[in-house]
C-alpha cells in the first residue's frame, strides 16, 4: 500500500473483494496493518506468532478457539486472539471484518 492523502472508503474496498477470505490492506499505522476481509463459511484452523484483532464491520461471525468456547461477534464488536491460540473464523452468512495485526502476519498462520 502506498502513502495517500485521501480517505479510504471501507464500503468501496469491500465491494472489490473477490470472495470469501480474500483480504485487502486498508492502512498502516505504527507497527500494525489494517486489513478488511469477507468471512463466509469456515476458514481452516491456524495460529499466529502475533496477536490478531478482529473487528466485525457487518454481519455476524464466530471465532472458534481451540479448547475454549467460541466468541460470536456482531457489527461493532471486537476480539483479540492472543498469539499462539489456534482459531478459525466461521460465518453462516457473509460478514466483513477489519483485521488489525502485524504486517508479517500471514493469512493461514504458522
What function would you assign to each model-found segment?
Residues 1-35:
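A short, N-terminal "cap"/entry segment at the start of jelly-roll beta-barrel domains
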Residues 25, 37, 44-48, 64-65, ...:
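Short histidine-centered beta-strand/loop micro-motifs
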Residues 30, 57-58, 74-75, 93, ...:
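A cytosolic small-molecule/anion-sensing beta-strand core signal
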Residues 31-33, 40-43:
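Intrinsically disordered, low-complexity, positively charged segments
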Residues 32-33, 61, 69, 85:
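Short acidic/polar mixed-charge low-complexity motifs
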Residues 38-39, 47-64, 100:
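Short, conserved beta-strand element in jelly-roll/cupin
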Residues 67-83:
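Short acidic-glycine-tyrosine-enriched beta hairpin
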Residues 83-110:
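Ligand-binding loop in jelly-roll beta-barrel domains
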Amino acid at each position: 500500500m502506498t502513502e495517500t492523502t485521501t480517505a479510504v472508503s471501507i464500503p468501496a474496498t469491500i465491494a472489490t473483494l473477490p470472495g470469501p477470505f480474500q483480504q485487502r490492506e486498508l492502512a498502516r499505522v505504527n507497527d500494525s496493518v489494517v486489513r478488511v476481509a469477507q468471512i463466509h463459511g469456515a476458514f481452516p484452523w491456524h495460529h499466529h506468532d502475533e496477536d490478531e484483532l478482529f473487528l466485525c464491520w457487518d454481519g455476524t461471525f464466530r471465532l472458534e478457539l481451540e479448547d475454549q468456547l467460541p466468541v460470536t461477534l456482531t457489527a461493532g464488536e471486537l476480539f483479540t486472539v492472543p498469539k499462539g491460540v489456534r482459531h478459525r473464523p466461521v460465518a453462516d452468512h457473509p460478514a466483513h471484518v477489519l483485521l488489525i495485526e502485524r504486517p508479517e502476519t500471514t493469512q493461514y498462520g504458522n
